[in-house]
Design a protein with these regions (language model features):
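Short, small-residue-biased leader/transition segments that mark boundaries at the very start
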Residues: 1-7
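Bulky hydrophobic segments
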Residues: 11-115, 119-142
Length: 142
């Protein structure tokens, strides 16, 4: 049991070393998703929050892609791992956040359009990472 714990600790440390900026962005998105924002004049701009959602998830997914591609330039990690970790996980994470906002807070509500905006951000980041960044980093794994 002791050696298993040591291996798990090492694996966790490995993720922190490979994805430090992504982890910071994820924590920031969690904070922004659950804090009670003050009322401002910006609330009057229609759908500004949707643009913020696109940007948050574009940033999260994009950084996950960049850090994956950088960390796995020289090994045989299949590219589908990036699709799961940098696209699917942020989309599922987004859905969980929307459900938690709806059912576990009194000052936030889940919103299908927020989920769609979050997914749009992850899609945009993934397309740019796969078709623009990955070829430039010479990552050609299927």
């Amino acid at each position: 049991v002791g050696s298993e714990m040591c291996i798990r600790d090492r694996d966790m440390l490995s993720y922190i070393k490979k994805y430090p900026i992504s982890l910071f962005i994820i924590l920031t998105v969690i904070y922004l998703s659950f804090f009670k924002p003050p009322k401002t004049d910006l609330d009057e701009i229609p759908n500004l929050d949707k643009l913020v959602h696109v940007c948050m998830y574009l940033g999260m997914s994009g950084m996950l892609w960049l850090e994956f591609l950088r960390a796995h330039r020289r090994d045989n990690a299949p590219i589908w791992h990036a699709w799961v970790g940098a696209f699917l996980c942020p989309v599922l994470f987004s859905g969980c956040v929307e459900l938690l906002q709806e059912y576990c807070t009194t000052y936030r509500g889940g919103d299908w359009l927020d989920f769609a905006a979050n997914t749009t951000g992850a899609v945009l980041a993934s397309l740019v990472a796969y078709y623009v960044v990955r070829p430039r980093m010479k990552i050609n794994k299927q």
